[in-house]
Amino acid sequence: MAKQKQRGTKAKARRTIKPTLYYEIVGLTLFALSIITILQLGVVGKSFVLFFRFFFGEWYIIGVLGVIALSVSFVIKRGWPNLLNKRLIGFYLIVLAILMFSHITLFNLLTKDGAVQNTSVIVSTKDNFFLEMKKGPDSVHLGGGMFGALMFATCYFLFDEVGAYIIGIILVILGILCITNKHIGEVLAPVGRILRSQFQVMQGDYKDWRAKRTAEQTEKKKTTRSTRSKRATEQEEIIEPMEEISIDPPIISNFTENYPVNEQEDKRIEVEQEELITSPFIEEAPPVEEPKKKRGEKIVESLEGETQAPPMQFSNVENKDYKLPALDILKFPKNKQVTNENAEIYENARKLERTFQSFGVKAKVTKVHRGPAVTKYEVYPDMGVKVSKIVGLSDDLALALAAKDIRIEAPIPGKSAVGIEVPNSEVSMVTLREVLDSKANNHPEEKLLIGLGRDITGEAVLARLNKMPHLLVAGATGSGKSVCINGIIVSILMRAKPHEVKLMMIDPKMVELNVYNGVPHLLTPVVTDPKKASQALKKVVSEMERRYELFAHSGTRNIEGYNDYIKEHNNQSEAKQPELPYIVVIVDELADLMMVASSDVEDAIMRLAQMARAAGIHLIIATQRPSVDVITGVIKANIPSRIAFAVSSQTDSRTILDGGGAEKLLGRGDMLFIPIGASKPVRVQGAFLSDDEVERVVEYVIGQQKAQYQEDMIPQDVPDTKQEVEDELYDEAVQLVVEMQTASVSMLQRRFRVGYTRAARLIDAMEMNGVVGPYEGSKPREVLINDVQEKSS
């Protein structure tokens, strides 16, 4: 009886404790599973992640957090919470809106990429979920899950996509109202108060700004009136009131810092190079690898089968004893002494900024580059300052700096700055030796690398002639053209052996290039007769055509490929074939050639400029008369690389560079160099080369090897076909034809009142003496000379 009573007490106690333990156990279990799900621990964690992602998609963490909140409620309250109270309903509405927005965004992206295979949103979401089950959690984007898919499908079917967005926004607003337990007016009232207060603050700030601006404009007008009155009395008074302006010192880049040259280094170099038989341009021959047998056999067979190939004209082979000239032949540059140049640069920078301020231009000098002849000030304008306003102040800036002339580069390529180039008080000489001794010249394999000078930053400027591929040099008399041409020729002589580069020089002035007669690099003696010049150019055209025939027979495309082809053949065959050298044609005065035989010269130059690059033939044309009848449009179109020295007018500058700037150069080697592909020209101080240095280089080269001229390239004497004409009207007829620049028998009949027979004899005599061209049917005959030539003859 006692035992039965004890069992009943225990059962009763078990029945009274069970509900509380049940909720605590369920709460702790749900909490543990939620943590495992968040951390994705094991198979259980990953499975629950997939479960929640199926319903909530990428927002599955909301479902997990909801389970955590439910577990905490079980443990604390030990009972079921009210899941349908007003605040929770508001939370549900916001979550549904978020899931729907997420699903709309997902399907817009999938539709744009064409990744949607099924038009049903629910089916597509289910397919994506099954795909994720295969690949693993977080491998596929599920948007808002199945809840989001149901919401999106329903709203899209009823209201379209825009209506779905509107429904989502309404759900968010209703959710906020349910959570806050307020109506719309109470919720929006704080927002309205904030907007109203911000508007009042902005209104007050605008009134203050307007009053301040009015005061500044009034003060500015007073300052402008006082400044104008002071400027009328004395210029110094403009600067005095601005002495209190704090100007940050600009960064000065001096080109003389790149010069390690001094007398001790000169002596050290002389000790190291005791004899003039070594050169920094001599390249060591790389070891020749034995080509494969099959390739060699093909080359030999192809060369043996070339029965139609034209014969080689350049038969001279490499002279193993030839030594390139050393740099010691050229003079060492003098040390550049820097005294108070930095102080002058700082003062000029202050003057520039003061001048800008006096004209109402907000700009600041931030960096200065001192070059050999000019100093470049980099000016950074403030936002809203027009570049054209700075360019328009060029004369005022020159007046403030007391400069001869200034050049404005607006803007500097690659920088948001304007460059103002001011001439130096003293021009520092740049020698060819220091240019060739720079690091940029450390390319012994480049046989056509020529030295030009130094730019404004002090860097050596060298150019590859084979990349240009032709060069036009123009400028007024005494501006430095001849020195530039000599520097180019000496650069080639210092780098290339006679079998590598050949030269043809045309010098109608007879004094500039005659010093190079006897150089082994010459194809012919220097051509000084203008009538022979056109013949020489035609021979170069014939050589170009012959080379293209060689390229066609050998299956190559340019001179580099052909020479590599010949090297492989010579390694495999005993019958050696010479390589093709580069040919550089130098014309020192184009204007004189155009006067004598304009049509022939222009046609030859046009053909060479258009086609000669691949054949290894390059033109360097110089002229001191940059007019459109000398530098024609055809020549300019085919010679993109140009050098402009100082000219007298902007028209001449446009003829050379297709733009202004050369009229503001200083002369004495100051040039604008625009290589092929450049958007703007580069200002360069040309390298100086004395006549004594040229003679020493020529003597050394001639001492290494004597000249072997190519007979086929030497122009023949032009026979004088002029004959004396007995008719007393001949001279008057020639003068009339030259003045009218047209010739016909009928014109002579009308003007001189003669018969047809006599007028026809006069025309025939003019044709025989080279005054007019041949008969061209109904067209008038071409007049071959102009008024200037007729007077000179």
Curated annotation (Swiss-Prot):
Domain (FtsK) ranges: 458-654
Transmembrane segments: 25-45, 56-76, 88-108, 136-156, 157-177
Skewed-composition ranges (Basic and acidic residues): 212-221
GO molecular function: ATP binding; ATP hydrolysis activity; DNA binding
Record region (Disordered): 212-235
SMART domains: AAA, Ftsk_gamma
Chief subcellular location: membrane
Membrane topology: Multi-pass membrane protein
Residues involved in ATP binding: 478-483
Homology family: Belongs to the FtsK/SpoIIIE/SftA family.
Domain writeup: Consists of an N-terminal domain, which is sufficient for the localization to the septal ring and is required for cell division, followed by a linker domain, and a C-terminal domain, which forms the translocation motor involved in chromosome segregation. The C-terminal domain can be further subdivided into alpha, beta and gamma subdomains. The alpha and beta subdomains form the DNA pump, and the gamma subdomain is a regulatory subdomain.
Function field: Essential cell division protein that coordinates cell division and chromosome segregation. The N-terminus is involved in assembly of the cell-division machinery. The C-terminus functions as a DNA motor that moves dsDNA in an ATP-dependent manner towards the dif recombination site, which is located within the replication terminus region. Required for activation of the Xer recombinase, allowing activation of chromosome unlinking by recombination.
Name of the protein: DNA translocase FtsK
Chain's gene name: ftsK
